[in-house]
Amino acid sequence: MSQIHPTALISPSATIDKTATIGPYCIVGDEVTIGAHTVLHRHVVVTRLTRIGEYNQFYQFSSIGEDPQDLKYAGERTWLEIGDHNTIREACSLHRGTEQDGGLTKIGNHNLLMVNTHVAHDCLIGDHNVLANNVGVAGHVTIGNHIIVGGNSGIHQFCTIDDYSLVGGATLVLKDVAAFTMVSGNPAKAHGLNIEGMRRKGWSKDSIDVLRQAYRVVFRSGLTTVQALEVLKQDLLPKESKIEFLIDSLQKSRRGVVR
């Protein structure tokens, strides 16, 4: 049987796994699903229409699955999905999607959202990411995998933050952040590769050296994006398969990448 504190308020339409824990003064609303071994510590509100996986931790004063802050929203049935092994610290706000963009906000697995992080409607967040204190993620943003976003940073609507990148503290991101890059400033500018992140993943020196070459081609050579892509594909991709991540970033970007 689930461990539910007597002061918690649970909707009859909520589904809570028998191994989950619902702490004091939590509220679990309509059509909420909470998976195995997930813990709502205390004073957590899961408003409605939210699916939460296994082994997640939610800390006090978090607001989960609230209506989107979008003037077009008119009460449609939209959803928030949260995967497994995530830690959501104090006072985070995670909003559901809007009908105009698929009706879903989605957070993957093994993410750490630190104090007062906001994830707006229709965002898609992958796996193994860290969003530090007071990060604001506007609507329709895509954040990939293995990314760190420094505290007090803001990410503009519709931007993409690609895999293995690093956003420095107090950064304003107005364009897409290419894979592997390190950006900071207001507005954000590229300041090299996320070398320390690569080393922590155990990547070889040879792989990192090829990625350094790729960075210089794209960001420091003066070539157009089309010209840089040709060099990456013809000269560097045969040497290192991870170059494909950078190629993909450049090809799919609609806002242009931070340079």
Curated annotation (Swiss-Prot):
Which GO terms of type biological process are on file? lipid A biosynthetic process
Q: Which GO terms describe its molecular function?
A: acyl-[acyl-carrier-protein]-UDP-N-acetylglucosamine O-acyltransferase activity
Sorted alphabetically, the keyword list is: Acyltransferase, Cytoplasm, Lipid A biosynthesis, Lipid biosynthesis, Lipid metabolism, Repeat, Transferase
Under the heading InterPro entries, the entry gives:
Acetyltransf_C, Acetyltransf_C_sf, Hexapep, Hexapep_transf_CS, Lipid_A_LpxA, Trimer_LpxA-like_sf
Q: In which pathway does it act?
A: Glycolipid biosynthesis; lipid IV(A) biosynthesis; lipid IV(A) from (3R)-3-hydroxytetradecanoyl-[acyl-carrier-protein] and UDP-N-acetyl-alpha-D-glucosamine: step 1/6
Compartments where found: Cytoplasm
- The main place the protein resides is cytoplasm
E.C. number = 2.3.1.129
Reaction equation(s) it catalyzes: a (3R)-hydroxyacyl-[ACP] + UDP-N-acetyl-alpha-D-glucosamine = a UDP-3-O-[(3R)-3-hydroxyacyl]-N-acetyl-alpha-D-glucosamine + holo-[ACP]
Cellular component aspect of the GO annotation: cytoplasm; membrane
* PANTHER family recorded: ACYL-[ACYL-CARRIER-PROTEIN]--UDP-N-ACETYLGLUCOSAMINE O-ACYLTRANSFERASE (PTHR43480), ACYL-[ACYL-CARRIER-PROTEIN]--UDP-N-ACETYLGLUCOSAMINE O-ACYLTRANSFERASE, MITOCHONDRIAL-RELATED (PTHR43480:SF1)
Under the subunit heading, UniProt states: Homotrimer.
What this chain does, per the entry, is described as:
Involved in the biosynthesis of lipid A, a phosphorylated glycolipid that anchors the lipopolysaccharide to the outer membrane of the cell.
| UniProt xrefs under NCBIfam families | lipid_A_lpxA, PRK05289.1
Q: State the HAMAP family in the record.
A: LpxA
Q: Which family does it belong to?
A: Belongs to the transferase hexapeptide repeat family. LpxA subfamily.
**What's the protein name?**
Acyl-[acyl-carrier-protein]--UDP-N-acetylglucosamine O-acyltransferase
Organism source for this protein?
Answer: Psychrobacter cryohalolentis (strain ATCC BAA-1226 / DSM 17306 / VKM B-2378 / K5)
